[in-house]
Protein backbone atom coordinates (compact mmCIF):
# COMPACT_ATOMS: atom_id res chain seq x y z
CA UNK A 1 0.00 0.00 0.00
CA UNK A 2 1.39 3.39 -0.98
CA UNK A 3 1.45 5.81 1.92
CA UNK A 4 1.12 8.83 -0.40
CA UNK A 5 -1.56 8.60 -3.08
CA UNK A 6 -2.96 10.65 -5.91
CA UNK A 7 -5.07 13.52 -4.56
CA UNK A 8 -3.22 13.86 -1.24
CA UNK A 9 -2.11 17.29 0.00
CA UNK A 10 1.65 17.20 0.57
CA UNK A 11 4.32 19.63 1.72
CA UNK A 12 7.87 19.65 0.31
CA UNK A 13 10.56 18.92 2.90
CA UNK A 14 13.76 19.38 0.87
CA UNK A 15 15.02 21.11 -2.24
CA UNK A 16 14.50 24.52 -3.79
CA UNK A 17 10.72 24.30 -3.29
CA UNK A 18 10.99 23.53 0.44
CA UNK A 19 7.86 24.56 2.33
CA UNK A 20 5.53 24.64 -0.68
CA UNK A 21 2.24 22.75 -0.56
CA UNK A 22 0.51 21.03 -3.44
CA UNK A 23 -1.69 18.15 -4.51
CA UNK A 24 -0.28 14.89 -5.87
CA UNK A 25 -1.55 14.67 -9.44
CA UNK A 26 0.31 11.58 -10.65
CA UNK A 27 2.50 8.74 -9.41
CA UNK A 28 5.28 8.14 -11.94
CA UNK A 29 6.48 4.90 -10.33
CA UNK A 30 6.94 3.52 -6.83
CA UNK A 31 9.27 6.30 -5.71
CA UNK A 32 8.46 9.43 -7.76
CA UNK A 33 5.36 11.59 -7.88
CA UNK A 34 4.22 14.78 -9.59
CA UNK A 35 3.00 17.56 -7.29
CA UNK A 36 1.03 20.44 -8.82
CA UNK A 37 2.92 23.74 -8.64
CA UNK A 38 6.16 22.18 -7.35
CA UNK A 39 9.45 21.46 -9.17
CA UNK A 40 8.57 23.50 -12.25
CA UNK A 41 11.38 23.68 -14.82
CA UNK A 42 11.73 25.56 -18.09
CA UNK A 43 12.29 23.45 -21.20
CA UNK A 44 13.38 24.81 -24.57
CA UNK A 45 11.18 23.28 -27.27
CA UNK A 46 11.79 23.29 -31.01
CA UNK A 47 8.87 24.11 -33.27
CA UNK A 48 7.30 21.07 -34.93
CA UNK A 49 4.90 21.96 -37.75
CA UNK A 50 3.82 18.31 -38.16
CA UNK A 51 2.47 18.21 -34.60
CA UNK A 52 1.34 21.83 -34.71
CA UNK A 53 3.52 22.94 -31.79
CA UNK A 54 5.30 26.25 -31.65
CA UNK A 55 8.80 26.60 -30.32
CA UNK A 56 9.84 28.54 -27.25
CA UNK A 57 10.35 28.17 -23.56
CA UNK A 58 7.79 25.86 -21.94
CA UNK A 59 7.25 25.45 -18.19
CA UNK A 60 6.81 21.83 -17.15
CA UNK A 61 6.18 20.12 -13.81
CA UNK A 62 8.76 17.42 -13.15
CA UNK A 63 8.54 14.45 -10.74
CA UNK A 64 9.89 14.68 -7.20
CA UNK A 65 11.07 11.80 -5.01
CA UNK A 66 8.58 10.75 -2.35
CA UNK A 67 11.21 10.98 0.39
CA UNK A 68 11.28 14.75 -0.17
CA UNK A 69 7.58 15.24 0.63
CA UNK A 70 5.33 14.57 3.62
CA UNK A 71 1.57 14.43 3.82
CA UNK A 72 -0.08 17.62 5.12
CA UNK A 73 -2.28 17.28 8.19
CA UNK A 74 -4.99 19.96 7.95
CA UNK A 75 -5.97 19.53 11.61
CA UNK A 76 -2.52 20.50 12.90
CA UNK A 77 -1.42 22.61 9.91
CA UNK A 78 1.91 20.77 9.75
CA UNK A 79 3.61 17.95 7.86
CA UNK A 80 2.90 14.51 9.26
CA UNK A 81 3.92 10.90 8.79
CA UNK A 82 1.62 8.15 7.57
CA UNK A 83 0.98 4.87 9.35
CA UNK A 84 -1.01 1.80 8.37
CA UNK A 85 -3.69 0.47 10.71
CA UNK A 86 -5.44 -2.87 10.24
CA UNK A 87 -9.15 -2.77 11.13
CA UNK A 88 -12.18 -5.00 10.69
CA UNK A 89 -14.36 -4.08 7.72
CA UNK A 90 -18.16 -4.21 7.59
CA UNK A 91 -18.05 -7.69 6.06
CA UNK A 92 -15.66 -9.03 8.71
CA UNK A 93 -12.54 -8.91 6.53
CA UNK A 94 -9.36 -7.15 7.58
CA UNK A 95 -8.92 -3.73 5.97
CA UNK A 96 -5.77 -1.59 5.94
CA UNK A 97 -6.37 2.14 6.40
CA UNK A 98 -3.93 5.04 6.40
CA UNK A 99 -3.67 7.12 9.58
CA UNK A 100 -1.73 10.19 10.72
CA UNK A 101 1.05 9.16 13.11
CA UNK A 102 0.69 12.25 15.32
CA UNK A 103 -3.04 11.97 16.03
CA UNK A 104 -4.10 8.51 14.84
CA UNK A 105 -6.91 10.02 12.73
CA UNK A 106 -7.81 8.21 9.52
CA UNK A 107 -6.72 9.88 6.27
CA UNK A 108 -9.73 10.52 4.07
CA UNK A 109 -9.60 10.14 0.30
CA UNK A 110 -9.51 13.40 -1.66
Curated annotation (Swiss-Prot):
One CC-aspect GO term: ribosome
Presence of keyword rRNA-binding: yes
GO biological process, one term: translation
One example GO MF annotation: structural constituent of ribosome
Transmembrane segments: none
Annotated family: Belongs to the universal ribosomal protein uL24 family.
Record-given protein name: Large ribosomal subunit protein uL24
Organism of origin: Variovorax paradoxus (strain S110)
Amino acid sequence: MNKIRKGDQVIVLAGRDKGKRGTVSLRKDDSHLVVEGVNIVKKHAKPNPLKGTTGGIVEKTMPIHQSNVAIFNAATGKADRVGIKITQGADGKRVAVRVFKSSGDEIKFA
